[in-house]
């Protein structure tokens, strides 16, 4: 049995959270997973670790964690892997991210019985280009 955890960045704006939650609803409807949870890097609850723990409570063997980010960055290469207890692909010595916003993030690795499988971010995909074209048409009033 497989559970899914979608990871959003988190924001003070409620819309950001609602978007990730709506994507989770679609994944739950379209996929065949035991449960689909949502966790956030910062500024929103639940945390990534809380979402993974909740997913594990459903008794699954594997939890697939999917960053709902377009591309890799410090969060997907370093921060999320740390939270999952996985080896980060980003060396802290390479970190020029200090100028960026730093909120009080908990990097304590989550401890669950299930195997954690870490997926790639969304990436360049023709389906995303279709959405971009839809947004262009909407902006031009050509819906």
Swiss-Prot record:
It is an enzyme of class 4 (lyase). Substrate binds at residues 45, 70-75. It comes from the Archaea. It catalyses: Co-sirohydrochlorin + 2 H(+) = sirohydrochlorin + Co(2+); Ni-sirohydrochlorin + 2 H(+) = sirohydrochlorin + Ni(2+). GO terms for molecular function: cobalt ion binding; nickel cation binding; sirohydrochlorin cobaltochelatase activity. Co(2+) binds at residues 9, 75. GO terms for biological process: anaerobic cobalamin biosynthetic process; methanogenesis. The active site is at residue 9. Coiled coil: none annotated. Its EC number is 4.99.1.3, 4.99.1.11. Belongs to the CbiX family. CbiXS subfamily. PANTHER family: SIROHYDROCHLORIN FERROCHELATASE, CHLOROPLASTIC (PTHR33542:SF3). This is Sirohydrochlorin cobaltochelatase.
